[in-house]
Amino acid sequence: MGYGPIKATVGPALEMLYQPWIRGEENIPAEGAAILASNHLAVIDSFFLPLLVDREVAFIGKSDYFTGKGVKGWAVKNFMKTVGTIPVDRSGGKASQAALQAGIDRLRSGQLFGIYPEGTRSPDGRLYRGKTGVARLALLSGAPVIPVAMIGTHAAQPIGQKIPS
């Protein structure tokens, strides 16, 4: 099962349960590269944004999602691979270089690329200082940056809560 079938099967349930909405989708190009730079409040953010955009969106995701143990670890890793998530090593310095290069490659091939400039979820719903990855992606790929705001998802799924309420 690939990105499209997962979106087609999981998407309607998410739309029915959570009724996410988007405003300004006309700013997302129908074709060609663009960087969707969003604040990050909850795990569910990475489901809602692709659900509301007509094109496939590849995201960076922490490398921990690809190294879990047991059945849950296997399921998470395979889901992340299937939806095109690029693992990023967040230990600092040049550790994230490979993930950013993979993002540049996707952008140069005309795809949408989602990234959370803060580098992690906000623990309290506030916006924190972003890292330089978005600027580097834009400068090296020539892709436009489209700002995205997630609103209220931290209330639906606080950090540590497994399933959004």
Model-derived features: positions:
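A transmembrane-helix-recognition feature enriched in membrane-embedded lipid enzymes
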Residues: 1-23, 55, 71-83
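Short, basic, glycine/proline-bearing loop/turn elements
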Residues: 9-11, 82-90, 117-121
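Short gly/ser/thr-rich secondary-structure transition/capping motifs
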Residues: 15-23, 95-97, 151-154
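A cross-family acyltransferase "interaction/gating" segment
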Residues: 28, 112, 123-165
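Residue-level preference for the first positions of well-ordered beta-strands
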Residues: 33-35, 112-116
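Hydrophobic/aromatic ligand-binding patch that stacks against planar heteroaromatic rings
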Residues: 48-49, 79, 105, 136-140
